[in-house]
Amino acid sequence: VSRDRECRVVILTGEGRGFCAGLDFGGYGSAPGFEWHGKVEQGFAVQRHIASLIPRLRSLPQPVIAAVNGPAAGGGFALVLGSDIRLASASARFNAAFIRIGLSACDIGTSWLLPRLVGAARAQELMLTGRIFDAEEAGRIGLVTDVLPDDALMDAAFAKAFEITANTPLGVALTKEGMWSALEIPGLQAAIDLENRQQIMASFSDDAAEARRARTEKRS
């Protein structure tokens, strides 16, 4: 996907009535190359392989829109958190389910992502209880930007994608990279330094030149 120049936006949604209920523990198997290692080594290799999904989403040049059409639990919840834009249907439900099966709720990036979306206090409550919360609450606490009727969710996701594609691919990719990097770097000046470099890179691109010509000529 990352090398597909025809793909401008990625939309994640579930098939059927749910977004993603999490990992299929019975069918995951072992990590390649670790089949003959001990249980601890195998388990750690599998864990690292699963957790690498979120950095892979982050590294895509295309924005990722999560269109949450039902329950998003455990690993599915992490997929929502790792997306760039989050929309939910009225029937969406969320929970950090790991803690409900005797594991830590800190998994697949959840402990880093959730506090940055909803604040540390709310994240601690949701992760320590593992409780299920609905789309209305998700919207109220800022986890999702929009809550829509079930039959309007995908139309809204595609409309948002088309809004994004009105901008240049490079500008979008640099904005996504810059936003994620700004969350990870420690201070304002470091963020500004990164922004300065990105703006100069973008300003000399063919896309930016064409966008300026279109604006001057009042083309869309």
Q: Whereabouts are the PLM-identified features?
A:
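CoA-thioester-processing core
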Residues: 53, 57-59, 67, 73-127, ...
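A short, well-ordered alpha-helical element
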Residues: 1-8
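C-terminal long alpha-helix characteristic of the crotonase
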Residues: 87-92, 144-193, 206
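Well-ordered beta-strand positions
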Residues: 85, 125, 129-131, 137, ...
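Glycine- (often His-adjacent) and acidic-residue-rich active-site loop
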Residues: 6, 14-56, 102-103, 186
